Each structure stands twice: as C-alpha cells, then as structure tokens.
Amino acid sequence: MFGKGLVKKSLLFFSGVSTMAVFLVSCGATRIWESSIQLLVSNDEATLADKSFSEMSYEGIRRYFRSQKHIELPSPNSSLLQDGNGLWKRPGRTLSDRIATFKNIKNDGSDVIVATGFNQQEALQAISSDDRRYLADKNDLAKVGFIFVDGQIEKEYNVINKTPQFRSTPLNISSVAFRSDDGSFLTGVATAVYLNLNQDYFLKKNGATNNSSQDLTVSGFVGVPIPSTLSFLNGFRLGIAYFNEVIYTHLSDAETTSDNKSNSSSASNSVLVQLKQMQGNDKKIKKIKWISPKQGSDNNSNLSIDDHKSGSFSSTEPRATTIINNLLDKGVSAIIPVAGPQVNLAVNEVARRKAHTAIIGVDSAQELLDINQDAPDKDQLIKGNKKIIPFSSIKALDVAIENMLIAIQKGSDNNGYKGFGYNNIGTVGTSSVGISEAGYEFLIDPVFWKTTQSQGKSMATNMTNLKRLSSDDTNTKKALKEVSTHKNGSDKDGIIGKYSNLLTKKSTTVTAVAQKSMTDNNSGTEQKKNLSEVDTKKKEKESKGKTQSNGQDSGQQNGKETNDIISKYSKLLTMTTMNNKVMSSKKQSSDDNSFKKTSENGDWVIKGDELTKKKSTELPAFAKGADYPTFPTEAVSVINGSTALDGKGFKWSFKQI
C-alpha cells in the first residue's frame, strides 16, 4: 500500500546505496553508455532533467538497476547524460521518425525501450499491427521489448467509421496508465483542509489586483487536454467537492478523540479536532470555490476546458504565464498546474508577486525539489511546510517502471504489475498514485460520523454511502475514531486502503466502510472488521492482533501512533461499479476488461452526498471537455491468448564503453 516508503523513494533524490558504482574517468568527451534499457522521452522538446515526467521515468530505470543489479546509473542532471549517448533519446516528430528511433536504439544494443508519453502510441500500434506497410518494421523490432508509459495499447486503434487505423497484438509491449484521479482526489481533500487551517493567510489575497473576495478559491490548468492530464484535474476537483459536500456538511457530527476526553496531545492537534474548533468559533470553515483562469468569467455557470489549457508542456509557454497571472490577479488560494515544467513558472510568479497562493505539485514530490521556494510572508502560515508548494499529487512513474522491468525480467507478476502483452494500471493499491508525505497531515479520516441517520435520510448506496454508525458501541467508536495525522511517525496505509477498497467493491450495495449489514444493526465486531478491512488478510489479522494484545486502538504499536487513513481513502477511490466510478459517464459493460473513453460534457462532482455529474455553486461543471479514460483497476491482457515475448533472456546490463 501507499506509504512513506513509496514517497521517499519517489522524490528523485537517491543516496549512494549501491554495492557497485559506475566509475567515470574524465577524458574531455561525452561518455557513451551501453545499456539494456533506454529511455525515449515524449517529444523533441522534452529533456531528461525536467523535475517531472521524463526524470521520474528515468528514475524507474535507475531504481531497477540499483535494486536488481546493484549498479548506480548517473543522476538525471549529470552532464554525462546527453541525448543519444546510449541512455536516452528524443523520438523525432513523425511516425516514421519514431520507428526509425526505435531501430536506432535497437542498434545501440538495447533490449528494452521505455517509451514515455501519449505521443508514442501511434508508432507502437503500428509496429505491433497487421498492417503490411509496417511488416518489415514489426519483424525488425520483434525481439525488442517496449514499456509504454502513461497510456495503453488498444486492440483496435483510432477507429473511424468502424474501421481502425491499426489492429494490434502487442506481444512485445507492456503499457501502464495511471489512475491519477485517485491521487489528485486525495490532494484535493488535503488542499481544502490546508487552505481552511491557514484561512488568515490566504484570505489576505496578497498579490491580487482584486482582493475583496472572502472566498477560499482554487483553480488549475493542463498543458494539453489529454486523458492523463484531465485525470489529474478532474480528480482534484472531485476531492474539493468531497470536502465541500461531505466533510463540510457532516463535520458537526464528527467524533474525535477529544470527544472521548482523550488527553493525547496528538489528538488535540489533529486536523479534525482543529476544524471542529474552527466551526465553534467566529472563524468558520469555508467551502472551496473553483475559479476560471479566464478574466471576467467567474460568474458563468459553465467552464470551458479551453480556458484551462496552456497549449503545450514547454517550460517557457507564454500562455501558461498568462493563465497563472490571471489567477493571481483574482487572488486564487491554490493552483494545480498539470503541465510538466510549467509548475516552475507558477512558483516563480507567486514569489515575484509575493502572492498568498499555494502551488500544488504534480507527478513527483515537488515540494522537496529545488524549484520550491519559501512562501511570501511564510511566518503567517500556521500549518504546513511554509513553502509555495506545500505537497504534491504523486504519479510514481519510477515505481511502475521498476516493477514492470522486474516482471519482464523474471517472467511473472511483480507487485501487481505484469509484463509484455498487458495494459497495467497504476493505482493507490499498486503504490503508483497518491499524495506526497507532506500532505498526510491534512487528510481527514473519511469515516468520522458518530450518529445514525434515520432510514428516510440515509445516503444513497454508492460511493458516498458512508453510513453514520451507532456511537454507543465501543468497537464502532474505536473504528471510527480519527487518529492523529502527524507528518512524522504516522503510517497512513489504513485510511487510504479503506477509501480504495470502498470503491473496488463490485457490488453497488456493499462497501468496505458502509456495508448493508451495518444498517441492519450488525454486531460491533463485524462493523469494526468492515471498517478496518484492508487489501490483504495479513494486514487485517495484524490490525486485530494489535487491538487484542494491548487494549489500545488498532493504530498503536510500540507506543507510536499509526492509523488507517490511507487504507480508507484507497478503498474509496477505485470502485469498478459504474455508479461509483470517479470519472465514468457511460454505463460500463459487464466485461470491464477494456479501456473506455467519453467525450460527454462536464465532469464528476459530489453533490448532496451523492457522486453525480451536475453543477454546484462552488464547482460548476466543465461545459466543454476532451476524451478521458475510465480504466479497469487491474492489468488486462491485450494479446488474445498469443504468446508474448520472453524477456528473461535479455542482457539486463549496463556499462561504459
């Protein structure tokens, strides 16, 4: 499950932990490397050390060589790494260019090409197709393995009038797409809490040309509106909506450890306690409003995705700077830029204008990178790291790539990832998406209600069906209790897992947190079991053992508080049922083994305790969108029973030549 270990290993910073290092001898010339694995960046404008997509992908290769071969590859910002020197290449601009680059990498002696970004798909579909025009290319590259990052190979690609451009059987390709909406959902929830706990700071609207608003506001933009970027944006909006319509609505019913007269200092400092205290004072918790980057458009009932795109992933994109400054003019409280290196533009503009605005990181834990800066008037921030980037929505490309390489090498699954012939899915459950560690302290246990709703007011039996349980049962109260979420010393796997499992249930009437049996007054023991359920029986047994052995909450071990926040969120976030999907707008067939796209207008929000596609005052729906995928929650075979390429015989080597 997603936890501290993942985040720390995903930050792009690694110490010299290998038992064998590559020793470099200076000779005044560019070093040439011979590697079984090469990275192919997304386009000719991309660079390796981008603090984002390309760099995280390269780190996956580094992680593989470090863990499996005890070899330390050069760091991504090393001057010894240049385009075409044997470790990474740019792909070219056309279909034929990309196929030629595949062959060049093969001629370098590489066995596996890690091809990143949606731009690679057409070439990969071509060389795995039955199209006679590409038969020679297919045969030439048949013994080369490919990992397609941030997309999926389709059996029928680009279907127009029922005729596909390519029919593909990817015997030598393993792909991975990411449920980035899951990770950014967590980030949206944490952002809403972070802004509220720092209300005084963000309501000053420093740096704004119009600072009269007393709203906490957020916005975001993408570089190009493609499935992988829209997934981030819509998941973030859903997390904000979850705070507005569920957490905000039911906060007065929250049961906290302080309600049980706990003397724990950690309990008194927990975010749930602090939010309840705010509700009881003159300073009220605020719902979070979404504003448009377009000037003068905030009163419109509809939003356009066209106003939320910069048009490229260039680090110098002028439209990105315009979008950022438009939002700063409006006094926006937080921005999530899903546009690669353009997060750096956002940080620099906030610093230049001394704006009281948070920038939410994307892909890696960007709050730890050197692009981050101290927040203007940082001492006025009560909570958080006092930086412009407080935390990030993680898409752990490095974790996925490392696991896929290991799966290919050994010819069997590795940590939920499969090898050639499969479309893999990066989820919270496979430790591939989530929120960075700095955001953990702002995640609220989603199961915090203490009273039972009447049958007439019970919530719908879908995603937000978090039934309020009876507070007179000791085990129920213990299971529902919000546990401290300090940045240090707290394991959040439990809560994320609960969220994940809630949404991975295939039945619309059964969830991990709100089982039908609970509404039938099931025993407290059974309720506790349901609430603390995690992905494996081992974890469930361990949790039960902790409670029985020391009489304390199941989240305590060796005097150090842990909790199950991550587990709960994980259960909430990956439901395969159509009604519970975060981003589904067309009814799923009973066969969920396919990738589906929708171009319907709008995106999902939570309204009135239900997950629906409708407008709300705070988050109007997008009136114009682009295709985004609804992914299955586990790897899917796309080779129709054919025999995939065997990678166990690859060299799996790296050396200087």
Curated annotation (Swiss-Prot):
Lipidation (S-diacylglycerol cysteine): C27
Feature: compositional bias, Low complexity: 546-559
Top-rank taxon: Bacteria
Membrane topology designation: Lipid-anchor
Biased composition (Basic and acidic residues): 469-495, 526-545
Signal peptide start and end residues: 1-26
Lipidation (N-palmitoyl cysteine): C27
GO cellular component terms listed in the entry, alphabetical order: plasma membrane
UniProt region (Disordered), positions on chain: 291-316, 468-496, 516-563
Cellular compartments annotated: Cell membrane
Keywords for this protein: Cell membrane, Lipoprotein, Membrane, Palmitate, Signal
Ranges annotated as biased composition (Polar residues): 294-304, 516-525
InterPro entries, per database record: BMP_lipoprotein (IPR050957), PnrA-like (IPR003760)
Membrane as UniProt keyword: yes
Transmembrane segments: none
The family this protein is said to belong to: To T.pallidum TmpC.
Protein name (record): Uncharacterized lipoprotein MG040 homolog
Organism: Mycoplasma pneumoniae (strain ATCC 29342 / M129 / Subtype 1)
Phylogenetic placement of the source organism: Bacteria, Bacillati, Mycoplasmatota, Mycoplasmoidales, Mycoplasmoidaceae
